[in-house]
Structures are given as structure tokens and as C-alpha cells.
Amino acid sequence: LTTHLRRAAGSRVRALLALMAALCAVIGTTALTTTPAAAADQRHPIYAIAHRVDTLAGVDAALKHGANSIEIDVCAWWNPNEWRAYHDCSSAGDNRLGPSFDSMIDRILSNANAGRRLSLVWLDIKDPNYCGERENRGCSVAGLRDKAQRLTAAGIQVLYGFYEYHGGNTPDVGGRGWQSLEGRLGSLEGITSTGTRDQVQGAFNRSGSGFPAGRRAMDYGDSDITKGFGNCTEATYNTCAELKKGAGDRDAGRLAATLSWTTTYNDPWYVDKLLGDGRVDGIIAGYGAFTGVREYDDSWQCANSIGLIRDWVNRHGGTHRMAGPGDRLFR
């Protein structure tokens, strides 16, 4: 059209283009913040997180089953530097097992473009100190975050998970991988540490100065959810009671979210306690100790595990709802 406009209209064209660019910027920014509809709905948004989604087919299965979030185990390899979706890093040795993290992102985004958009991707970082940011950025946690920006650019939240797998002189919590995220997390990114309320609080007090309270999450549980679960009334230690205390910290603005793991298809009582008394924001579900822990797939066990969470939310629709793409855990 512009090829037929006179020069006198040039200034109007430029003004129109500038206006269009500004509108696009506003739309893009809105996509990365809580949508007005989500903000107006005061019900508690819940995240049904598919467990151990370490295959491309697992991404598809989780979305098919109604999961609005997934947990991916990520392992680093050096020379060539890369991250892959795999659970047992130490046993793999030099064998590069599992799909590349890039291919997992590709699958997540292809589903999102087809209208099947996840709300949250939780990265369980198995070896966060394996590579240094300066020496080998590609296999460092900083490099992992570089890749994860493709998810946040699409409006998908990313949670970086640190569980104390190693300890000693090279702790995961507070180590160089953890430090590489300090002061860098964007509005769609958060960091979680595993443990009791006091353990998590201590971890952030010692090593969390670069993480505002609105980016901090707490997770607690076991691959055998029955182990140490309790009944949400104990003073300390037990899973549900500690998460209940964490929910109090969240409500007071000291945490962004509380999350638990891992329920399977025959755990309705535990789902009820976690979402009801424990008031968690999300639960990892799929194969657990009862079924034998393995990668998420298109099985009835995995489908029913996610279904238990969705069913609970449906029964409590006056106070709870499933989190959607417009919801935000972090602030």
C-alpha cells in the first residue's frame, strides 16, 4: 500500500508505524505479566506438575493428560558443552543420554503454538556446579538459563530447582551454579530449594541475597509421598506440616510459592491434604515409589495422577482453579 502514497503522507505513515510498534510492545509486555482476567480471579491457581518429563513424548503426554506444568531433570555435559534431559547424571558418565534440552524446548514451544501452552517448567538441576560460567558457559547454569529464555519469551514461567545432591565443599545450594542466577532472574523466573521450612529459610538467608522474596519457592516431599508425610498438624519435620508453615511464609510475602512431590494415581488422600490443609501451590505427580519411579509417559497411571489434582480442583471450584498461561507465581 505504501508504494502508492505521496511524499506528503510520509510523516503520517511513520507516525502510524510508530504507533503500531508501541502497541506491539505493550502487547508483548502484557503477555509476560499476569493477565487482567487472572488477576481478577481471586481463587487459588494450582499447578499440576508432570513428574520426570525427560522425553519428547513425555511433553506431549503431560499436556494430553491435562498437566499445566512439567518437571524436567537436566544434566550437563562438557566438550561439547550442552544440557540434556536425563535423571541419573552420575551413572551416565561420558554417555550423552536423553534428548537435548534444546529439543525439549522446541517440543514445548511447538505445543504452545498449537494452543497447548504450559504455565510452568520446573528444571531439576542435577549437577549445577559441573561447569563454570566463565570457563564453559554452555554447560553451566548460566548457559541453561540462556536457553530457558526461549520459554520465558513465550510467556512460560521457569523454576530453577536446587536440591542438595552433593553438599560438602561443592554444595548445590549456594554453589557457583546457584550464584550465577543471583540478581538475574526475570519476572517469569524463580528459584526453589528443597527442605523443611527452616532449612529453606536458612538456605536463602545464607545464600539468597540476590533473590527477592517474590522469586523464592520452597519444595518438600519424597518419591514415596507416604514417607514422613504426617497429617499436617505436627510441630516440625513432616512433609505436610512443613509445607503448611511454608504457605504461611508465602502469605506473609516471604516466599513466592510452596510445592510438593511426588503423588501417583492412588494418592487421593495425600493430594487432598496437600492442597487443602497444606495449601500448596502445586504438586509433582506421575510415577512414584509405589509404581516404580521412571520417566513420564502416556500411561493410565500418569494420566490418573494428574487427574487426581484436577479432580480435587474441580470439587473446590469456589476457592481453587487450575493455573493458566496468564497466571504468575513470581512477583
Where are these regions (language model features)?
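Catalytic cores of phosphodiester-bond hydrolases, prominently lipid phosphodiesterases
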Residues: 41-54, 58-331
